[in-house]
Amino acid sequence: MIPANFGGTELIILLVIILLLFGAKRIPELARGLGTGVREFRKGTSGAYEELEEKKGEEEKDEGGKKEAEASGRGEEEQQARAAGEAGRKQG
């Protein structure tokens, strides 16, 4: 099991191992590649987050429009029922 907290000694040992494995010349290349990868990952996650927010907003607008349409539809039905009732009273 790998410990979650690294102390100063562990970090120094890790850096020495990396230096021995890759050499001093390749470490800047690796750091650049890692930085580029992290940047692309952040762009991707922020882009996905923005898409989700846009879709959420569109769905809320659609639901709001449906509720308004249903409410206006109910209002029209009530008006028709009232008109029919009044017409029936006038005839009777």
From Swiss-Prot:
GO molecular function, one term: protein transmembrane transporter activity
Pfam family, one: TatA_B_E
Major localization class: membrane
Cellular location(s): Cell membrane
Disordered as annotated region, ranges: 43-92
Cellular component annotations (GO), alphabetically ordered: TAT protein transport complex
Lipid bilayer topology: Single-pass membrane protein
GO biological process per UniProt: protein transport by the Tat complex
Transmembrane segments annotated in the record for this chain: 2-22
Keywords assigned by UniProt, alphabetized: Cell membrane, Membrane, Protein transport, Translocation, Transmembrane, Transmembrane helix, Transport
Keyword Cell membrane part of the UniProt annotation: yes
PANTHER family with a match to the protein in the record: SEC-INDEPENDENT PROTEIN TRANSLOCASE PROTEIN TATA
Subunit field text: The Tat system comprises two distinct complexes: a TatABC complex, containing multiple copies of TatA, TatB and TatC subunits, and a separate TatA complex, containing only TatA subunits. Substrates initially bind to the TatABC complex, which probably triggers association of the separate TatA complex to form the active translocon.
Protein name: Sec-independent protein translocase protein TatA
Organism of this sequence: Rubrobacter xylanophilus (strain DSM 9941 / JCM 11954 / NBRC 16129 / PRD-1)
Gene: tatA
